[in-house]
Regions:
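Non-catalytic, polymerase-adjacent accessory regions of viral genome-replication enzymes
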Residues: 1-61, 432-442
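Reverse-transcriptase-like RNA-dependent polymerase core
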Residues: 56-85, 208-231
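Short, conserved non-catalytic motifs in the polymerase core
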Residues: 70-102, 119-151, 228-253
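Right-hand nucleic-acid polymerase module
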Residues: 97, 101, 105, 234, ...
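Active-site-proximal segment of RNA-dependent polymerases
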Residues: 104, 108-185
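Conserved polymerase palm-domain catalytic core
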Residues: 163-276, 280-297, 384, 392-393
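Helical (often loop-to-helix) elements that flank the catalytic cores of nucleotide-handling enzymes
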Residues: 285-307, 335-336, 340-341
Length: 442
C-alpha cells in the first residue's frame, strides 16, 4: 500500500488525462447510446475547470450521485433471427455516462495504486480486472501483414487462453452462475468492500463513491424504444438489487464474491479461466469432469450461488474434445481443416443485428420509432457501434465480416426506403443530396 492521497485529490489530478485517453480512441469517442447521451467528444468539448471542481467537491463532500445508466438489450446466442426477444434469450447491459465511467476507472486505478495488495489478491484470477497481474504476449500481424509480438490482457487474454486450454484438455465444464450480478446483495457488497479494503482507515470518500456506483440504476427512457416493454420488465425485476453489468466496477464486485471460490479451485490445481462470473474448468477425463462439476456446485452453494436453475434448460454443461460452445458471447469452434480452435461471432448474432436494421421497411415506422430520418441515421449508427464495440474485429475470425455486413445492411435499408417509399431513383440522387437526406448535412 502506497502513501495515500484522498480520492477526490486523485480525481483532480487524473480526470482530464483519463478523459483524453478515452477521446484518443476515435472509433468509440463519438459513440452515442440514445439521443440525449453525451459522447466522449461532446463531454471533452464542453469540459472546463469548473466541471472538474464540481466533480471533486461532490466526491469530497460525500455527495456524488451517479447519472442514470443506459439500458441496452443484447440477444443471447439462443435468440434466433425471428424469435421474439424475452428475458430468457437476451441480456441487459447498462452503460454509465462518460463522467461516471471515468470516475469508476479512476476508482479502480486508485485501489490498484493505494490498496494494491488487497486489490491484487481479490482480482488475481479475474481476467476482467487483472490487467497488471496477468498479461500474455502473442504472435500477431500488424496492418501491413508483418509478424509482431503483442501484449494482451482482459477479455482478449481470456479468449486466447480458452483456445489454448481447449487444445490441451479433452473436456471443458462451461459453468453459468444463475443470475449472478442480479443476485448480488448491494448492502453486503458495500459492507464487504468497507471491511476488506478500508478496514480501520475510515476512508469515507471511497465508501461513499462505491455506494453511489453500486446503487446506481438504469433509466427506462434511455433505452431503445423498440424494446421499451422488455427493458421495463428487466428494470422492474431488478429494482433495488444487484449490480448492473456494463459498469467497470461490476467485475470488482464479482471478484469480492468469488474470492474464496477462486482460491479453492486454484489450491486444487484445477485448470480454470474466469472473466467476471463466467468461468470454465478443464479436464482430460470425463469422470473427473463430472466430479469437478459437482465440486463447483457444492462450493458455490456455500455462498448462496448456483450453476443449476430450478426450472428450464440448464446452461452448465460438460463439452467433449470437438464440441463447439459459446464463451463470453463468442463461439469456440474446432476447425478440422486447420486442426485448431477458433473464435467466431455466433450466426444468430448476425441474424438478429441485421434483422433489427432490416425491420425498417417504411417511412411510417421510421417516423414512429425515430421521429425523422436524421435521427434514424443516428439510431443505425448507435446500433452498429453497440454491436461492433462488443463483437470487435480483433476478437473473432469473422469480426470484419460482421462489421461489413452491418454497414451494408444499414446502407441497403436506407436505399430501399428512398426507392420504395419516396419513389426516387437512388442512383440518380447526387452525393450532396444523399448527405442531406441521410445525415442532415448541407
Amino acid at each position: 500500500m502506497t502513501d495515500k492521497v484522498k480520492f477526490s485529490s486523485y480525481v483532480n489530478e487524473n480526470f482530464k488525462s483519463t478523459l483524453n485517453k478515452l477521446a484518443k480512441n476515435k472509433s468509440k469517442a463519438d459513440n452515442s447510446y440514445h439521443t440525449k447521451y453525451i459522447t466522449v467528444n461532446d463531454y471533452l468539448n464542453n469540459f472546463s475547470e469548473k466541471t472538474l471542481t464540481d466533480v471533486c467537491n461532490s466526491v469530497l463532500k460525500l455527495k456524488y450521485n451517479c447519472d442514470h445508466l443506459t439500458p441496452i438489450i443484447l440477444p443471447k446466442t439462443n435468440c434466433l433471427k425471428h424469435d421474439f426477444m424475452t428475458v430468457d434469450n437476451t441480456r441487459l447491459v447498462c452503460v454509465p455516462s462518460v463522467q461516471d465511467r471515468i470516475l469508476q476507472k479512476l476508482f479502480l486505478e486508485y485501489l490498484k495504486e493505494h490498496y494494491d495488495k488487497i486489490y491484487n489478491r481479490f482480482c488475481e484470477y479475474d481476467h476482467a480486472l487483472n490487467k497488471d497481474i496477468h498479461e500474455k504476449v502473442v504472435d500477431t500481424l500488424d496492418e501491413a501483414g508483418k509478424p509482431i509480438k503483442k501484449t494482451i490482457y482482459g477479455i482478449r487474454k481470456a479468449l486466447d487462453d480458452v483456445t489454448e486450454y481447449r487444445s490441451k484438455y479433452k473436456y471443458v465444464i462451461k459453468a453459468d452462475i444463475v443470475k449472478f450480478f442480479d443476485n448480488i446483495n448491494r448492502e453486503i457488497a458495500v459492507k464487504k468492500f468497507e471491511r476488506e479494503f478500508i478496514g480501520l482507515n475510515e476512508d469515507k470518500e471511497l465508501i461513499a463513491i462505491f455506494k453511489s456506483f453500486v446503487y446506481c440504476d438504469a433509466k427506462l427512457d434511455y433505452g431503445d424504444l423498440k424494446y421499451k416493454k422488455l427493458i421495463e420488465i428487466y428494470l422492474e425485476e431488478l429494482r433495488g438489487k444487484g449490480v448492473r453489468q456494463g459498469m467497470p466496477i461490476a467485475s470488482l464486485c464479482s471478484s469480492m464474491y468469488l474470492y474464496e471460490f477462486d482460491n479453492l479451485i486454484i489450491k486444487n490445481s484445477i485448470p480454470y479461466i474466469r472473466y467476471a462470473d463466467d468461468f470454465l474448468v478443464f479436464s482430460n477425463s470425463y469422470d473427473t469432469a463430472k466430479k469437478l462439476k459437482n465440486h463447483v456446485q457444492k462450493n458455490l452453494k456455500k455462498i448462496d450461488l448456483d450453476i443449476e436453475k430450478l426450472v428450464g434448460e440448464q446452461k452448465t454443461r460438460i463439452y467433449g474434445a470437438k464440441d463447439n460452445f459459446t464463451y463470453l458471447g463468442f463461439d469456440i469452434i474446432y476447425n478440422s481443416r486447420l486442426q485448431s480452435y477458433q473464435r467466431q461471432i455466433p450466426r444468430p448474432v448476425f441474424d438478429k443485428a441485421i434483422g433489427r436494421i432490416d425491420s425498417f421497411q417504411s417511412m411510417t415506422k421510421v417516423k414512429r420509432e425515430c421521429g425523422n430520418y436524421v435521427d434514424f441515421s443516428l439510431y443505425l449508427r448507435i446500433l452498429i457501434s453497440g454491436y461492433t464495440n462488443f463483437y470487435s474485429e480483433d476478437l473473432a475470425t469473422n469480426g470484419e465480416e460482421f462489421k461489413r455486413d452491418l454497414i451494408a445492411a444499414s446502407k441497403n435499408v436506407r436505399k430501399k426506403l428512398i426507392t420504395d417509399n419516396l419513389n426516387i431513383d437512388f442512383e440518380n440522387i447526387g452525393s450532396a443530396n444523399k448527405r442531406m437526406f441521410f445525415f442532415g448535412i448541407k
